Structure formats: structure tokens, C-alpha cells
From Swiss-Prot:
It comes from Bacillus thuringiensis subsp. jegathesan. The lineage of its organism: Bacteria, Bacillati, Bacillota, Bacilli, Bacillales. Toxic segment of the protein is located in the N-terminus. This is Pesticidal crystal protein Cry24Aa. GO terms for biological process: sporulation resulting in formation of a cellular spore; symbiont-mediated killing of host cell. The keyword Ribonucleoprotein does not apply. Coiled coil: none annotated. GO terms for molecular function: signaling receptor binding; toxin activity. PANTHER family: ENDOTOXIN_N DOMAIN-CONTAINING PROTEIN-RELATED, PESTICIDAL CRYSTAL PROTEIN N-TERMINAL DOMAIN-CONTAINING PROTEIN. Promotes colloidosmotic lysis by binding to the midgut epithelial cells of insects. Belongs to the delta endotoxin family. It comes from the Bacteria. The gene is cry24Aa. Gene3D superfamilies: Galactose-binding domain-like (2.60.120.260), Pesticidal crystal protein, central domain (2.100.10.10), Pesticidal crystal protein, N-terminal domain (1.20.190.10).
Amino acid sequence: MNQYQNKNEYEILESSQNNMNMPNRYPFADDPNAVMKNGNYKDWVNECEGSNISPSPAAAITSKIVSIVLKTLAKAVASSLADSIKSSLGISKTITENNVSQVSMVQVHQIINRRIQETILDLGESSLNGLVAIYNRDYLGALEAWNNNKSNINYQTNVAEAFKTVEREFFTKLKGIYRTSSSQITLLPTFTQAANLHLSMLRDAVMYQEGWNLQSHINYSKELDDALEDYTNYCVEVYTKGLNALRGSTAIDWLEFNSFRRDMTLMVLDLVAIFPNYNPVRYPLSTKISLSRKIYTDPVGRTDSPSFGDWTNTGRTLANFNDLEREVTDSPSLVKWLGDMTIYTGAIDSYRPTSPGDRIGVWYGNINAFYHTGRTDVVMFRQTGDTAYEDPSTFISNILYDDIYKLDLRAAAVSTIQGAMDTTFGVSSSRFFDIRGRNQLYQSNKPYPSLPITITFPGEESSEGNANDYSHLLCDVKILQEDSSNICEGRSSLLSHAWTHASLDRNNTILPDEITQIPAVTAYELRGNSSVVAGPGSTGGDLVKMSYHSVWSFKVYCSELKNYRVRIRYASHGNCQFLMKRWPSTGVAPRQWARHNVQGTFSNSMRYEAFKYLDIFTITPEENNFAFTIDLESGGDLFIDKIEFIPVSGSAFEYEGKQNIEKTQKAVNDLFIN
């Protein structure tokens, strides 16, 4: 978190005198751990501006791995096996060179305040590095040799034997030592990395079983399905258990809770959401994957300063667990794209009844405009904080089209008495780095010695992200303020930022040569008894819940007019019937419709096996922009995760005919078997 220090009884801002060697416990919004020397203000500011702030190593490394996996799956079929091997080598190299297992275990233990046992540290580090070593040397080496000469019997035998040996090692570790009861939470990021590699191997076996001449009596498709279910449920259950254990009552409790939620989303849940795409039967083409979840960086403030009270322990801010959780996070909703912001400047000062103090202009309130996917009109204006006028308001424009991937802020604070618990905090400056290079600035006209704070996420190649390589974009900014009616000195204005993954597409673009996944929460409208509910942890975002007499509407942009098979990934709490329609851009009358009945898929918890796939129809778009609706006509609750578009060769009529023949043949075969 952000540590500060006062220069005199009225001024603030540097890092703590005693924390030069303190690890960055709460990543992504940290101070540079710099201490002001005996110099003047300009020297100190110059020193601060040279500071380099980076995210926690474990989360940063894993975020890069997620970017590589997304890129690999997006080119899985379009590229050659040689390219796939190269990507796999890149993932394993990232794991070993950055010692992912060790840094992730240390990070988790820092969050949950437990002393890590050396035996567990050694176990996780040595086992994952050992698995990656044989994965690279034995399996990928043999796979590359076979790919270069597939007719060579020796290479065929070698890759089959290497697969069986290495796969057995992964299976044993993932079923055994990684699930040690006392260290499940600590080892979860390590488990997830190993599971990711194991699933990629099983996918290869399904795809190349015949070419490798693997044993025909082993059903590798079933092995893969079983592993997907097991690994997904295990990761979600352990994550949920660890998160719930961190619930508390204080602001410090919330910081640990939010840090765990954010880092484990990056280290575990993002990969888990990608797991289903390793099924080559269901995903035979390259796949465009979108993650719609949000993560929240810590409020821009400070903790652990010996000289002044901090925002986690003062009456000037929301400083308890429940208030912070309510104010910082959003309830599940359709994806809202941040369009623009109007920022208002107020003042904080060190006012005392006997003498006036120093006034500092800070960000005191803002009004955000939000858009839904596929809509050009503002769907919501939301204000947090006050519309103060210490300075003229600042307008940050065109955020909707210019992704903001990085922030540079200046945090300021004052207090009436050194060591008092009435310290007041605020942000006097914030620069927004966007992909167009405009880098708009909010700047108070009353600057003050202040601490530079950078908030950023790594790209695939860059450690801090840049306009051409970034993984997250800003989706919301809020001011956190409390009722200050009884506080004469003013109140704190702390900034909270929310971020979403850069894979999310604001246009719902359907690609012509890839399977396109579109999260259900990118709809533009819900009507009737429909709502958005929290996802189970494995879906990469929230779900649309449809109850009796509800309608879900969403728009898409089709980059090439060709045939696509449309299917949904869903879970159903009871049997239900729904009607899906395709509409032209004019919306006068539907072009196509299909009615489906689905069976209930779960009754209690929404685990991996609760989600099913349903083919709706095959479409032949007449125009680039069109829309879909689903009307739940009867039955239980339907939970929609995503809608998928699969490119189809030939005419829609030919494809539907082929599908009907295959269904009939399967029914006949099942009849004779039974």
C-alpha cells in the first residue's frame, strides 16, 4: 500500500521512515518506498518522479502467462503445430525463469498473514520446476521432432512414450502433493499452472492420438473432460475457502481481502476461465476469448505511517470492511463502458480554530457517463463525491474509444497535529495514459508536496504495459467519502479504480475464421424478470439470470457475412423453455427464430458440470450489424454464461441437413446399443 510521512506538522507526504525494506504487500497502487532526504521541495519532487512502481511479481508474471494463453488459443488452428510448441515453450520459460511457484506462494502468505514453511516452499518450487523441465525436455522435444517428420516411426514412438511418461507425472502431482490439506491455498497458483500445462497435453492427445498411435482403449476425450471438471471445481473451491477466511471488520481486513481477490483472479481464476477451451472437440478452431470480470486496485491513500494517522484508522474516510466493500465494488450488472468523466476540485486543509492552515486542492467528486455494449446513448450518469468548485471542473473525454491502461497520480494529505488521527487525504493530480497518446490530465491549481503513485498492469511483453501491449483498461473511478458534517477540518477524498480485461470487446465483433465467445453480460438490455448475478468463479465474469417472462437483448457486429452456428453456454435451475430470435438492425421483424426446451442442470451449487452447451441455429447474416433476443417462456431459472459463433463452411441449409443426419444416425446407434 501507499506509505507517507510528514515533513512538518501541516505537510505530508513521503514514505514511512521505517519501511525502506518493507515488501509491497498490496500491489498495483503502491508507493516507491522512497524517503525524503534533507533537501528542498524541488529535489524531493524530482526524486519522486524518478520512482518506478511495479505490481506484485506473482500477479504480474501470471497476467503475462494468461495473455500468452489467450493469444495461443486464438491461433491454435490457424497457426502450425510448430507455432503452438513455440508458445508452450514461452509459457514454460516464463514459469521457470520467474520462479512462479515460489513468488506466488510468498505473495499468498503475505496476504493471509501466515508464516510460510520452508518445506512447503521447497515442495511447490521443486515440483513445478521439475514438471516444467520434463515437459520441455521430454515432451515438447519429442513433439517437435515428430512434427518435423511425422512419417518416422521412431519419432512417433518417442512422442507417444514421452507423452505417457510426462502426463503420468502431472497426473500424480495434481492428484497428490499439490492438494496437501494444510497448504491448499498457498499452493493453488502452483496447482493452476501445472493444471494448465496438463490440460494442454491432454488436448494434444485428443488431437493426435491416431498420429501417435496411442492406445486405442484409452478415451483421452473423457480423460480431458474429467480433468476439466476436477481442476475447475478444485480451484474455485479452494479460492472461495481462502477468500471467505479473510472476511473481517476493519479496513486492514478489507485490504487483505481485496488483495487476495485481485491477485488470485490474476493468478488462478483467469486461467480457470480459459480451461474449457482446451477441449478440441468443442473448440476445433482458434477461439477469441473474452474475460468480463472486474478487479479493484486499492484506494489511493496510505497505510502504516508512524507519523500520522492513516486512512484505515481515521474518521475522515470509510474505514471498515463492510463500508469499503459496498463503496468500492459494484453489484453484478451488464458491462458498462466508461465514456467520459467530469472531475471537481475541492479543498482539504490543516485548519485549526486558532489559525488557518494550508489549503490543498484535490479531486473531490466526479460524474461518470457509462454506455452499454452496442448502444450509442448514455445509459447512466453516476456521481460520487461532491460537485465542489475550488477550481474549474476538468473533463476527461472519449474514454469509450481510447483505452486507458495506466495512471500516474499524486496523493496529498494534511493533519492538524503530528501523530493525530484526523489526517485528511486526497489526490491532487491524475494523468490518464491512453492508446491514442492523448494522456489527459487532471491537475489541481493548488499543488502541494505529494507522493507519485502509478497504477498499471503488465502486457504480454512489457512489465508496465504500453499503448501497443496492455492487458487491462480502466472501467470506473469512484471517490470514497464519509459523512463529515461534524468535522470542521474537511474530509478525505480517496480514489478507487476498477479495471477490466483488455480481451473484452465493446463492439461484440464476430470474427470470420475463429470461434467468437461473447459474454452474456455484454447485452445492451434486460427486461422483465431478468438480472445479472455473480458468476461461480469459473466463468471469467458474471452471468445473466433469466426467470419466467424475461427478455435478454444483445447486439453484434459481423466482420464478414458468412454462415455461423450459434450456441450458448448455460446452466439451468430446473427445466425451461425459451425462444431465441435474430433481428435486423432496423428491428422491425425477426429474421430467424428457434424455440428450445432444456433440462435442469443443477439444484445446489453451480459447479463446472452444471454448464452445458446448446446449438440454437445456423445464421446467414444479411448485414454487418444485427441483434438477438432470448425470451424465457416457461420453467425454471436459466443462467447464460456466453454466446458463441462458430464459422461454418457451405450453406446454412447444407450444414443443418448434415447435422440432422448425424443426429439421426446417433439415435439409431444408441437404439441398437441399448
